[in-house]
Structures are given as structure tokens and as C-alpha cells.
């Protein structure tokens, strides 16, 4: 977790070491990601509700991983530390990579545990509403962070260019909530 502390005054040698290690973690993560893709590659993939949530997880995890590479580079990390970019990265890596597989697992295992099938059509609606809502909520936060919006802000002055993207993120959170 030291790579989240690049702006705390660590010595240059420690910064270089943890930046390199943060970049190196992309290798096993990339292998893991491509192993998931290859697992589906030659199979007959049916886009059932559990598979939709799985593919949604893969896309969200990919974007979280790409932003992780970005924040492992010191100059960029210093520019976006304590901004909405970090909030968006965290939510893509942690929330998206946890919530979507859990929902997929519920849709997969619940019929096996209860003996009653869940409604496939409602499940697909739930997935698409959640997926669109999640990305409407957190993707604009990347841009807001690059524009300088700090995290833990409850209000801000007009004219900073954050209004529209912040409103989109707020609407996205409502959409995401409706999907769950």
C-alpha cells in the first residue's frame, strides 16, 4: 500500500522502489486477466446473467488496472493525489471487482441452492442498469480528478468546470442504485 503514499515525503530511493514494484504488479495481474479471457476464448459462451456480470467485472477490472498503472508513475500520481481520480481508481478496482462477481455468483448459485430459477430478463435488466450506472458514476471522476477536483469535497465554487461531470456522476449513482 506504500504506492498510495507517494506524496507523503518518502525518500527518493523508496519512491523509486515502490514505483517499480507498483508497475511490476501489472505482470501477474495481466497474466491473470488474460487467463480469464483465454478460458472463455474457445468455449461456447452464452450471455446468461452470471456471464454478463463476469464480463462486466472483466471490463471494470481492466479499466481499474489501467488507471493503476497510471498512478504507479510518480509524476502522474503527484498530480492526482487526493483527487477524484484516486476515488475513481479505488472504486473501479475494489467495488467493481467485488460487486459484479458477487451478483453474478448470486444469479448462478441461488437456483442451485433454492431449486427456483431467477428471472433471466430481470437479471439482464439489473446488469445493464448497474453497469451503465457504475460507469456513469465513476468514469467521470477520473476526468474530475485530472481537472483538480479534490476528494472529500462537499461543495465547490462555480466556474471550475466540475458541475456537469459531477452531476453526471450523481445521476449515475442513482442509476446504479436502481440496478441493485
Identify the role of each PLM range.
Residues 45-46:
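Membrane-interface helix-loop-helix junctions at boundaries between adjacent transmembrane segments
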Residues 1-6, 17-36, 49-74, 84-115, ...:
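Hydrophobic cores of alpha-helical transmembrane segments in multi-pass integral membrane proteins
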Residues 9-12:
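Membrane-lumen (extracellular) interface motif
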Residues 39-42:
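Short amphipathic alpha-helical coupling elements at transmembrane boundaries
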Amino acid at each position: 500500500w506504500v504506492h498510495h503514499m507517494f506524496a507523503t515525503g518518502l525518500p527518493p530511493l523508496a519512491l523509486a522502489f515502490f514505483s517499480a514494484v507498483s508497475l511490476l504488479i501489472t505482470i501477474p495481474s495481466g497474466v491473470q486477466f488474460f487467463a480469464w479471457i483465454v478460458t472463455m476464448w474457445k468455449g461456447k459462451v452464452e450471455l446468461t446473467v452470471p456471464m454478463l456480470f463476469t464480463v462486466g467485472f472483466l471490463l471494470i477490472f481492466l479499466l481499474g488496472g489501467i488507471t493503476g498503472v497510471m498512478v504507479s508513475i510518480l509524476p502522474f500520481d503527484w498530480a492526482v493525489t487526493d483527487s477524484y481520480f484516486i476515488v475513481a481508481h479505488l472504486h473501479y478496482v475494489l467495488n467493481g471487482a467485488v460487486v459484479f462477481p458477487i451478483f453474478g455468483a448470486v444469479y448462478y448459485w441461488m437456483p442451485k441452492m433454492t431449486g427456483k430459477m431467477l428471472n433471466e430478463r430481470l437479471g439482464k435488466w439489473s446488469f445493464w442498469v448497474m453497469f451503465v450506472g457504475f460507469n456513469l458514476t465513476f468514469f467521470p471522476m477520473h476526468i474530475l480528478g485530472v481537472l483538480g477536483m479534490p476528494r472529500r469535497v462537499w461543495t465547490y465554487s462555480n466556474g471550475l468546470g466540475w458541475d456537469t461531470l459531477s452531476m453526471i456522476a450523481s445521476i449515475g449513482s442513482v442509476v446504479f442504485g436502481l440496478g441493485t
